[in-house]
């Protein structure tokens, strides 16, 4: 149930670019971090290359692409190896979509506490406890 924000900059243009990015991010998040794509939310935003600076120069000036991915997941649900594999796979796939990437391209796996994070009006901790008690999460809230 991650919430993922993708900001990107590229000179490549395609009517399906944002959908391609969202699809790739969803696929790798499911495959490597084991997150259910049916409860994954992805926001994709384009940033003009003249407005993105890395290493002191704009991406437009350097003729390079970049992205910033911020993914929120429940704390302790992924290993260090999974997170490292996710960053590496994402860098490779996003380069295929966006073109040559600036070395200063970032991804942040933000591990948040289950009692402070959730969706549909319920925290992840409440869902976890309800699952252990074998009751519906909304009934556990009553």
Question: For each of these PLM feature ranges, what is it?
Answer:
Residues 1-142:
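A domain-level signal for the structural core that forms small-molecule/cofactor-binding pockets
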């Amino acid at each position: 149930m991650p919430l993922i924000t993708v900001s990107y900059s590229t000179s490549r243009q395609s009517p399906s670019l944002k959908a391609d990015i969202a699809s790739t991010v969803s696929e790798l998040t499911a495959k490597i971090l084991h997150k259910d794509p049916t409860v994954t939310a992805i926001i994709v935003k384009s940033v003009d290359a003249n407005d993105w600076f890395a290493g002191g120069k704009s991406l437009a000036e350097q003729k390079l692409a970049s992205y910033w991915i911020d993914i929120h997941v429940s704390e302790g649900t992924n290993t260090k190896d999974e997170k490292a594999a996710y960053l590496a796979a994402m860098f490779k796939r996003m380069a295929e979509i966006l073109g040559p990437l600036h070395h200063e391209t970032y991804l942040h796996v933000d591990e948040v506490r289950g009692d402070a994070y959730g969706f549909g009006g319920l925290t992840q901790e409440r869902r976890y406890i309800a699952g252990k008690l074998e009751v519906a999460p909304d009934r556990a809230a009553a």
